[in-house]
Amino acid sequence: MNFEKALSFVFGSEGGYSNHPNDRGGATNMGITAGTLARAYKQGIVKHQNIKALTRAEAAEIYRVLYWRPSKADKMPEPLCTLHFDTAVNHGLGGAAKLMQKTINNYAAKAGLKLSVAVDGELGPKSMAALDACIKYRHNLHLICEIYINEREKYFRAIVAANPSQACFLKGWLNRIAKNRRLLS
């Protein structure tokens, strides 16, 4: 199943407990924020709200229920599903959807496809149909993935440009981008 591969990829990038003062997400464990853990608790996915006590199995279930399925990564081919899932974990569902929509529009323009989607942060039926059309056109999934990774790198750099306090995270973010690129090779 693609989820297990994608989960392993994400766990390879996400560390244990962290509470960096500049991290806008606050305290995290294995990439799960305290806010996401509270949401998972309210939905009955986990039985506690202690971010430090989060287990790998609990994190995996949170990722499956709150990120994998809602991001629609489960509807994408490999390796795009892994890249998109990793992005959803790192940027949230809406952020990942916007990057995918920008990718669709960028790829369509490069390929000469006459389609575009709204960059609204919602991967609805129109966006998913456009993604499917892009994937089927010339079967160039590798290029779609490259564009997606490039859009993600631009996003990281824009975060730092807009808020220099986030520069302390740029090296780690770019390491994650490099890991995304290695997935394609």
Protein language model features and the residues they cover:
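Cell-wall polysaccharide-cleaving catalytic domain and substrate-binding groove, primarily
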Residues: 1-185
